């Protein structure tokens, strides 16, 4: 795929379980760009899993690390970045994301997110008595913030990963980021 503006980063935002890492990795592969996941980068740098960081430093400590990682990663050019679900909580992160890349909000309804994440013990915010209710509350609080920093929204629904990747590539083509989408 030919890039019209090879310097524009493609950044994925959305709630946990929306598919940011899976879709982002596939988009990066199709665009022949490096892929980064901010949560994975934090884990690699600290040598600790996200739940351990939450336990030791609290959510505020983790969000500090996340803001630093986002600032660092978005200084690069020509990358595809998947952010953590709460990356948009801080106004400075929303501003950086919006200014330093083309932001794709992968929107999924809370029920689908619950089905995808219900058995995952590596999601500290869902370690509650009612994780489905927690996802609904997170969606209500965060949806406006995702929309604020997004350049466009992709409704994930139930299409395949390849279907979502093609939708993203079509949006990138319409935004002038790539010349034309390639089929997988």
Swiss-Prot record:
Keywords: Amino-acid biosynthesis, Aromatic amino acid biosynthesis, ATP-binding, Cytoplasm, Kinase, Magnesium, Metal-binding, Nucleotide-binding, Transferase. GO terms for cellular component: cytosol. It holds the Pfam family SKI. It comes from the Bacteria. It catalyses: shikimate + ATP = 3-phosphoshikimate + ADP + H(+). InterPro entries: P-loop_NTPase, Shikimate/glucono_kinase, Shikimate_kinase/TSH1, Shikimate_kinase_CS. Binds 1 Mg(2+) ion per subunit. One of its GO terms (biological process) is aromatic amino acid family biosynthetic process. Mg(2+) binds at residue 21. Pathway: Metabolic intermediate biosynthesis; chorismate biosynthesis; chorismate from D-erythrose 4-phosphate and phosphoenolpyruvate: step 5/7. Its EC number is 2.7.1.71. One of its GO terms (molecular function) is ATP binding. Its main location: cytoplasm. Catalyzes the specific phosphorylation of the 3-hydroxyl group of shikimic acid using ATP as a cosubstrate. This is Shikimate kinase. The gene is aroK.
């Amino acid at each position: 795929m030919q890039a019209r503006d090879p310097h524009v980063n493609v950044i994925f935002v959305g709630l946990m379980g929306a598919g940011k890492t899976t879709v982002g990795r596939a988009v990066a592969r199709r665009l022949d760009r490096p892929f980064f996941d901010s949560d994975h980068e934090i884990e690699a740098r600290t040598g600790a899993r996200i739940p351990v960081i939450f336990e030791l430093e609290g959510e505020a400590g983790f969000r500090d690390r996340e803001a630093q990682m986002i600032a660092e990663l978005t200084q690069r050019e020509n990358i595809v970045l998947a952010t953590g679900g709460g990356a948009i909580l801080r106004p400075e992160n929303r501003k950086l994301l919006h200014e330093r890349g083309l932001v794709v909000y992968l929107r999924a309804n809370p029920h689908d997110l619950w089905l995808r994440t219900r058995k995952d013990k590596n999601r500290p915010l869902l370690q509650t008595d009612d994780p489905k209710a927690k996802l609904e509350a997170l969606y209500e609080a965060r949806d406006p913030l995702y929309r604020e920093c997004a350049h466009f929204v992709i409704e994930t629904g139930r299409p395949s990963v390849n279907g979502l990747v093609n939708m993203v590539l079509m949006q990138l083509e319409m935004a002038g980021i790539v010349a034309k989408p390639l089929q997988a």
